[in-house]
Amino acid sequence: MSPYLSKASNVLSLTVPIILYIISKAYNKFLSHNSISMTEKQFAVSVTNLRKRIGNKDILKGLSFNVENGEVFGIVGPNGAGKTTTLRILSGIIKNFEGYVKIFGLNPVEAKQKGYISYMPEDAFPYEKLTGYENLDFYAELYARGEKQLKEKYLKLGVEISNLGKRIYDKTAEYSRGMKRRLIIARTLMVMPKLSVLDEPTSALDVESAVRIRNIILDMARRYNMTIILSSHNMLEVEYLCDRITLINDGRVVASGKPEEIVKNTNSKNLEEAFIKLVFGDQ
């Protein structure tokens, strides 16, 4: 063998293992990345070590939880616990935070831009100079983005969800609080989002109106396999509506799981008693 061929052979014998090592590392990184992606896709919502600071105050101090697709999931806690801040982050409204948040594999802002998320704040009210129908028509037009058939589909579903009968054609200034709330939740859900985020959906409602709203939430979740995240102070409502919950206090998770599991684990009679024990201690 010529000295040139011998030298080339030696170079190859040294470089081939290095090349194979680099390829192997790249392949393993690819597999690892895809494995993470597949794990993300198993959940509608993934939250890990979520932190939010406003001014000098830490509002969220490392929240972690996952929400499965088609699940009605509750975020509960006392006033000031960080519920609304969490919901606003999940909805893509609050953009600056620390931690990991994915909505169907996307960050909240991307998911919002794709129309995956619909958010109903606690203080939402309809335009009172318009009728109920005109309110729904306005938002159906907005969400359909010029697609006539899609607008008609949204509008039809919105009228159905609100279940206001002939009152749908009255000015909303004449509506009771319960009727206004039904219209707002119809406006939120009629676009059939992949994720609906509802902040205190039955707040300050009479019993009949609250029951109507709860039934709407369950019906939409089941009919469209919609993932719904809601906050509530009403533990009876949470037990009735939610598949699982996360209870937060002072920006931290203090319990997570099915309502009945939390009741059992705290040796409580019901979720309200469990809530009191977990937040305020045995009294």
What is the predicted role of each segment?
Residues 99-115:
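Conserved ABC transporter NBD signature motif
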Residues 256-257:
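ABC ATPase "signature
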Residues 137, 141, 149-167:
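Conserved ABC ATPase "signature" region
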Residues 211-223:
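Helical segment within the ABC ATPase nucleotide-binding domain
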Residues 171-178:
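Conserved ABC ATPase signature
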